[in-house]
UniProtKB/Swiss-Prot annotation:
Keywords: Metal-binding, mRNA processing, mRNA splicing, Nucleus, Repeat, RNA-binding, Spliceosome, Zinc, Zinc-finger. Residues 429-458 have a biased composition (Low complexity). CDD domains: OCRE_RBM5 (cd16168), RRM1_RBM5 (cd12752), RRM2_RBM5 (cd12755). One of its GO terms (cellular component) is spliceosomal complex. It is found in: Nucleus. One of its GO terms (biological process) is mRNA splicing, via spliceosome. Component of the spliceosome A complex. Regulates alternative splicing of a number of mRNAs. May modulate splice site pairing after recruitment of the U1 and U2 snRNPs to the 5' and 3' splice sites of the intron. Residues 1-87, 396-458, 523-559 are annotated as: Disordered. This is RNA-binding protein 5-A. Signal peptide: none annotated. The gene is rbm5-a. The keyword Flavoprotein does not apply.
């Protein structure tokens, strides 16, 4: 019963009562809670690191546990739905039931280890040799502590694990080995309408707005389990006509690969694609071998995987496997996922690559199809290839005419993605096989854009002038680094932001957008003359021209950029010359006449219109039809002070005949297009108007040739211009500044010094002492034993007490600084003696 005794009020509130015990219990609870939280976070991080870098399918129990954790324990926003993490048990053994796999994971590796060390150690053991060794690294290049060792077959990995008893000693440290099993991902969902992969939390497609439920209902049978093996293909589930070679040396060439594979298969240079870095031009470590069929590829793969010792090229062990894509965008009926982006971009890259390779004759066997109809694996990608057939054919046609840009500029293909996939059999046919019409495919697959007319359904690079199109959206254009221009994926045109013109690579024609007609219209004929025409355009060429026509040269994106730049420069130069002909005179040649300024403003405002730009030819026609010539005596008059000087007038009159520009019958100035009431007004306008002089100068400049105009411009620039004199004339000479005042020394005020000459008998103190019996000259005190002179005010040294030696140097308050220094010097000198 003692434990049931209630605590009294005094004990609860006492200084050393149970409050101290309660605080101790709270501290223990906090420490326990913090320890559990840290243990939980450590287990989460450990689990995430392990799950993120497993490469192959996990057991069913792990899949169900991961699915429940993602779908139940996490909310839509990505965070855990249950806030009490301590209710969960994280102390699970992840390695209780490992599924055997041909990939082995090495954990607990030293930080300073590299792939070569692991590869040499693994290859030093007797038995099966690994196909590939991958060490996971951080961004800094250091090891993350784990690596993957992949074998060719499952029995090789299991026998190697049993031989080493799941342990390995590297640099004196025991390393644990486990089978690598992946964790499938179920977060994202695929839109069946547009083929876009959306996040799990989206209820509608980000591109087309289709509901998520529609895609779930339209999913093919067996697609629910397809994601489990979508990212990784099993040993017997995926075959391809292409083989990937890993661990290629940085300086290995195609000839070395051909010589290494020569004992097993007969290949040519066009069957091998060696991937290189664009910046360093060195190999990126892998290459692709394209074979005629998937059957031959599987046979070659089986031969290379069973080699003992394994295949080596330039001293490096080569890993061999089917070329496969790790990107998932399209779900096929058999459960595989194929990237829509990779299919289209790889098709374009393959077309560009094949067009640059030397043409092989049909008898040599070098022109192979990726996958032919009826072969194994082609049915898996038939639907995907048909969807992208129009776009692929258009890009291939552009490559054949030599006007398509480089593959990496229009549709870049990541080097890390395996670049060999099944293409449509229509593009790569064996000699003699029938081909389908590309135009029918384009017409069948092209669909008009939403909100536009049916005429807008033209395929890319098939712009027809006159048809209506949607307003171009420059925000969707893709920048082409190789050419420096922007590519429109909808129309296939190249856009130059400087000249705002479009370039059609198929027709080699320059276009511009007409907002009123909602269409692309061709530019002027003379504007596109600088563009390069297709080879073989003239039917009457010689035999050499026919031979060149048979071998068209590939026109790269750099050549297209040079053509557009040259054409834009010619247009800008024409515009600049036309604007220079209408440039007004310089500021010093402008006068202060208000009427002339107003007239010139109107003239400058109207000169931009097309009708006003044609006034010079109209004026010349009127001058040529003039029959009678006015008398020259009417022009003799004196210029006013506001007009130009005599040299300028002589230059104007000598260069241009002013009389041809006057209509004396209608009393009008043909140059300024003004009519006057009488002859005197017309004469004054001719002689005094600044507007007439400026227009005359513009007309004179328009008649000059380009060389004469440049010479005149150079002469004007070289002529010295006294701008200071112009400012003095216009604004006047400023007044000189006021002289600076002299600084006067401050006046010295003499203060009163009543005791400077001594104290006389008239002061009050002297009178008081005399009243008490004191006489002048006697000392103070009863017996006159005191001082006889008055006390002098003296300056003491700082810090010295009264009466201390050296406390006073005999300096008085009335002494000057010079006297005080001299007395202090003498006092210190006497102290030293």
């Amino acid at each position: 019963m003692g434990s049931d005794k209630r605590v009294s009020r005094s004990e609860r509130s006492g200084r050393y009562g149970s409050g101290f015990d309660r605080d101790d219990r709270d501290d223990r609870d906090n420490r326990s809670r913090r320890r559990d939280s840290e243990y939980k976070r450590y287990r989460d991080e450990r689990s995430d690191r392990y799950d993120d870098y497993r490469d192959y399918d996990s057991p069913e129990r792990d899949r169900m546990r991961d699915r429940e954790r993602r779908n139940s324990d996490r909310s839509e926003d990505g965070y855990h739905s249950d806030g009490d993490y301590m209710d969960h048990d994280y102390r699970q053994d992840y390695y209780m039931d490992e599924k055997e796999s041909k990939t082995i994971m090495l954990r607990g590796l030293p930080i300073n280890i590299n792939e070569n060390d692991i590869r040499e150690l693994v290859e030093s053991f007797e038995g099966p040799q690994p196909a590939d060794v991958r060490l996971m690294k951080r961004k800094t290049g250091l090891s993350r502590g784990f690596a993957f060792v992949e074998f060719y077959h499952l029995q090789d990995s299991t026998s190697w694990m049993e031989a080493n008893q799941k342990k390995l000693v590297i640099q004196g440290k025991t390393i644990a080995m486990h089978y690598s099993n992946p964790r499938p991902k179920f977060e994202d969902w695929l839109c069946n309408k547009c083929g876009l992969y959306n996040f799990r939390r989206r209820l509608k497609c980000f591109r087309c707005g289709a509901a998520k439920a529609e895609s779930d209902m339209e999913a093919p049978s067996g697609s629910s389990e397809a994601p489990q093996s979508a990212d990784y293909y099993s040993d017997s589930g995926y075959v391809s006509s292409a083989i990937i070679l890993r661990n290629i040396g940085p300086h290995t060439v195609v000839d070395s690969i051909l010589s290494a594979l020569a004992p097993y298969v007969s290949l040519v240079v066009s069957n091998i694609r060696l991937i290189k870095d664009k910046q360093t031009q060195q190999n990126r470590g892998f290459a692709f071998v394209q074979l005629p069929s998937a059957l031959e590829a599987s046979q070659l793969l089986q031969i290379l995987q069973t080699l003992h010792p394994p295949l080596k090229i330039d001293g490096k062990t080569i890993g061999v496997d089917f070329a496969k894509s790790a990107r998932k965008d399209l779900v096929l009926p058999d459960g595989h996922r194929v990237s829509a982006f990779s299919v289209a971009s790889t098709a374009i890259a393959a077309a560009q690559w094949s067009s640059t390779q030397p043409a092989q004759q049909s008898g040599e066997g070098g022109d192979y199809a990726y996958l032919q109809p009826g072969q194994e694996g082609c049915s898996n990608y038939g639907q995907c290839s048909q969807d992208y057939q129009p776009f692929y054919q258009t890009q291939t046609g552009a490559a054949e005419q030599g006007t398509a840009p480089q593959a990496e500029s229009s549709s870049p293909v990541p080097a890390t993605t395996s670049a060999v996939v099944c293409q449509s059999p229509q593009m790569y046919q064996q000699p003699g096989s029938p081909t389908q019409s590309s135009t029918s495919t384009v017409a069948a697959s092209a669909t008009p854009a939403s909100g536009t007319s049916a005429e807008e359904a033209a395929a890319p690079n098939a712009i027809v002038p006159g048809l209506k199109y949607s307003v171009p959206d420059t925000s969707t254009y893709q920048y082409d680094e190789s050419s420096g221009y922007y590519y429109d994926p909808q129309t296939g045109l190249y856009y130059d932001p400087n000249s705002q013109y479009y370039y059609n690579s198929l027709t080699q024609q320059y276009l511009y957008w007409d907002g009123e007609k909602q269409t692309y219209l061709p530019a002027a004929d003379g504007a596109g003359q600088s563009g390069t025409q297709p080879n073989g355009a003239n039917p009457g060429t010689s035999k050499e021209g026919k031979e060149k026509k048979e071998k068209p040269k590939s026109k790269t994106a750099q050549q297209i950029a040079k053509d557009m730049e040259r054409w834009a420069k010619s247009l800008n130069k024409q515009k600049e010359n036309f604007k220079n002909s209408f440039q007004p005179l310089r500021d010093e040649e402008r006068k202060e006449s208000a009427a002339a300024d107003a007239g010139f403003a109107l003239f400058e405002k109207k000169q931009g219109s097309l009708l006003e730009r044609q006034f010079l030819p109209d004026m010349m026609m009127m001058v040529n039809t003039e029959e009678e010539k006015p008398p020259n005596t009417a022009l003799v008059a004196a210029y006013s002070g506001d007009s130009d000087n005599e040299e300028e007038n002589e230059r104007f009159i000598g260069a241009v005949d002013d009389e041809k520009l006057m209509d004396w019958k209608k009393l009008a100035c043909l140059l300024c297009r003004r009519q006057f009431p009488n002859k005197d007004a017309l004469t004054r306008h001719q002689q005094l108007s600044d507007l007439h002089k400026q227009n005359l100068e513009v007309y004179r400049r328009s008649k000059l040739s380009e060389q004469e105009y440049e010479a005149e411009q150079t002469e004007r620039e070289s002529k010295y211009r006294d701008r200071a004199a112009e400012r003095r004339v216009k604004y006047g000479i400023p007044e000189p500044p006021e002289p600076k005042r002299k600084r006067f020394a401050p006046t010295v005020v003499n203060y009163e010094q009543p005791t400077k000459d001594g104290i006389d008998n008239s002061n009050i103190g002297n009178k008081m002492l005399q009243a008490m019996g004191w006489k002048e000259g006697s000392g103070l005190g009863r017996k006159s034993q005191g001082i006889t002179a008055p006390i002098q005010a003296q300056v003491r040294m700082r810090g010295a007490g009264l009466g201390a030696k050296g406390s006073s140097y005999g300096v008085n308050t009335s002494d000057s600084y010079k006297d005080a220094v001299r007395k202090a010097m003498f006092a210190r000198f006497s102290e030293m003696e």
